[in-house]
Amino acid sequence: MKQELIERFTRYVKIDTQSNEESHTVPTTPGQIEFGKLLVEELKEIGLTEVTMDDNGYVMATLPANTDKDVPVIGFLAHLDTATDFTGKNVKPQIHENFDGNAITLNEELNVVLTPEQFPELPSYKGHTIITTDGTTLLGADDKAGLTEIMVAMNHLIHNPQIKHGKIRVAFTPDEEIGRGPAHFDVEAFGASFAYTMDGGPLGGLEYESFNAAGAKLTFNGTNTHPGTAKNKMRNATKLAMEFNGYLPVEEAPEYTEGYEGFYHLLSLNGDVEQSKAYYIIRDFDRENFEARKNNVKNIVKTMQEKYGEDAVVLEMNDQYYNMLEKIEPVREIVDIAYEAMKSLDIEPNIHPIRGGTDGSQLSYMGLPTPNIFTGGENYHGKFEYVSVDTMEKAVQVIVEIARRFEEQA
């Protein structure tokens, strides 16, 4: 199983599937279509049935039941795309067997070093096989680790028919990283009563609370003139963007928050004197606080418009997803089964809120309650990203055990 995980994962991460916030196509990048087509063929090779990829790039497949019991149909999901925060092109995964727990030089030329000082969890992976980047790209364990685990788990169930299970549905979705994963997901066609996203982090992660999330695009319009004669004429769009950011509470940013604390996060800022564009994400677990944060952004924009003119700042803000807890609580047994599955495998469940989002956040509101399970990755979305193959193996075992327990309890 370990070699299959390594082989699949290292092959999958080499395919550039970064999504693109600016694109209006579905999916937003051709790499996701390419990857989806590959997975369709591999799902068929494994032996799954009803394997499809629709025009929007959503891949679905079925592992038929091997029991006569009336078992609820369950699903397992992962996403095709990788994050836009750092380059995902030309990923060169590096395999470190029997990791010694010490610093790893990812790229000697660029002096990129993965250190325990910066990442204190690193020594806990001593003895594991871990896969890192070469220091020039992200790895893409989010979510190709989860995707790999689902593929390997389905293969394992097919080759071990003594493990009884009900009908299992599998889905791989595009554009999760930009909040559009479930936008065209056909819940009815998927046909599951419940599902699990394999999109978590370290060993034991079990999550069924997520942020309420919104995205805000701000366009700042300036007036450019020669700087030598600019007095009372020039309006610097980049300075307007800086002024806007200055209104936000400094301590309410990702680098200063944890647990149930929300934040404003400036994802990118590009521009010049004439025009600048800033992209923010807004996050909070509490719905009232979430609405208050959005109103704060609107009020800052209004203040600046009154100061500089209506055209100086243009705001586009959209909700992306909501806290899934409200939809999971009525079917709490799906969390309990995952919890019991982990305990039976000597994995200590680590239940905590997702400081991020998964497709499950939106799917839960679309009628498909979907908690999230660990995949084994650390430091997502950057050059220090890595994954433990040993933990990936545990994730596969959890998928298999969840399927077995649903059948057993039917």
UniProtKB/Swiss-Prot annotation:
Name the EC number(s): 3.4.11.4
Q: Give the protein family.
A: Belongs to the peptidase M20B family.
Q: What does this protein do?
A: Cleaves the N-terminal amino acid of tripeptides.
Q: Where on this chain does Zn(2+) 1 bind?
A: 79, 142, 199
Q: Which UniProt keywords apply?
A: Aminopeptidase, Cytoplasm, Hydrolase, Metal-binding, Metalloprotease, Protease, Zinc
Biological-process GO terms, alphabetical: peptide catabolic process; proteolysis
Q: Which reaction does it catalyse?
A: Release of the N-terminal residue from a tripeptide
Q: Where is the active site?
A: 81, 176
Pfam families, sorted: M20_dimer, Peptidase_M20
What is its subcellular localisation? Cytoplasm
* Cofactor(s), names only, from the UniProt record: Zn(2+)
PROSITE patterns from the UniProt entry: ARGE_DAPE_CPG2_1, ARGE_DAPE_CPG2_2
Instruction: Name the domain of life this protein comes from.
Output: Bacteria
Protein name, as recorded: Peptidase T
Question: What InterPro entries is this protein classified in?
Answer: ArgE/DapE_CS (IPR001261), Bact_exopeptidase_dim_dom (IPR036264), Peptidase_M20 (IPR002933), Peptidase_M20_dimer (IPR011650), Peptidase_M20B (IPR010161)
**Record text on cofactor binding:** Binds 2 Zn(2+) ions per subunit.
Under the GO molecular function aspect, what terms does this record hold?
Answer: metallopeptidase activity; tripeptide aminopeptidase activity; zinc ion binding
Q: Which residues form a coiled coil?
A: none
Looking up HAMAP family in the UniProt record yields: Aminopeptidase_M20
Q: Where does Zn(2+) 2 bind?
A: 142, 177, 381
Record's Gene Ontology CC terms? cytosol
